[in-house]
Amino acid sequence: MNLEDIENYVLEAGSDDLATFGGFFEGGIHCQQVPDEIAPCIKEIADADFEIRSFLEIGVAAGGTTFLISHFLNPGQIILIDDNKHHKAGLRPEVLKGIDRVEIIGRSEDEAIIFEAAEYQPYDLILIDGDHLYKGVKIDFISYSLMLSLGGFLALHDSAIPEWGVGRMIRELKQNEDFEFIDEYVSKKHKPCGIALFRRVK
């Protein structure tokens, strides 16, 4: 899978906001990812010779990232958790039209939501992109990381925004013997958001 081709696909698929995420135009899949961050992250996972059978995404908005994961990694099961309070959440049915998925609507920290997500475990890829405060990211990690398969990937979005709490969580994860730090993808072409990628090894 060619990195340039992945990045161009993301650029041409449509951005949620050009100032925040870059891209060629606003609209399309309303992706909330910086193209030269999400592209190498996807390539790393695709090249790992590890089948992504089940994908859990926490914090979905319009579904742009879901669309990309479905397109490039083709997981057989897609589970989405979102409280639907994002102003672009109403676009999700159109963005994800034709993509089979289970949507769990509610706050990711709520016990009922965690229990429902657990019914579909294990997951081979989990993306945490919900509450970006340290406490919220920590709760999501504690609640969902045990649902990750051995060898599965854990991605955390917005790692490069210093005023948020994702960076602190990443520093802690680097000391966690159950996880291997793979890389952090930080844009060199646009204002960075950052994606950190880990793999469960224990």
Regions found by a protein language model. Name each.
Residues 1-127, 131-202:
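A short alpha-helical cap/connector motif
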